[in-house]
Amino acid sequence: MAITVNLRYTGKNGSARNFAEEMTASGTVAAIRAEAGNLRYEYYLSFDDPETVLLIDQWRDQAAIDAHHASPMMQTIVALREYEYQQRGHACLSGNRAAAC
């Protein structure tokens, strides 16, 4: 069963948006999308709060998420996390009909 992870990045002075833009421009987003088990990896900007970016990240199963977290890709992401922002998130199984998912 697919697992969707919603991550909300909030910062100041455009830091969350800059992080998402660098993830995309550096090719990191494309590399994550190419990982085995990744079904979706998309950033969305908020109309209500220009300092907030939403990442919708979907994986085939927990094993795919675990492989991603254990991969060298995580070091690439950590290196880009020099931006000042906060991250909140939650995960939902694909059959979950909760409004937040």
Features from the language model and the residues they span:
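Short, well-ordered beta-strand segments in beta-rich or mixed alpha/beta enzyme
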Residues: 2-10, 40-70
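Short amphipathic alpha-helical segments
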Residues: 15-39, 73-78
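Short low-complexity stretches enriched in small and charged residues
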Residues: 7-15, 21, 44-48, 97-100
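Short, low-complexity, polar/charged sequence segments that are solvent-exposed and flexible
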Residues: 24-28, 60-63, 73-76, 87, ...
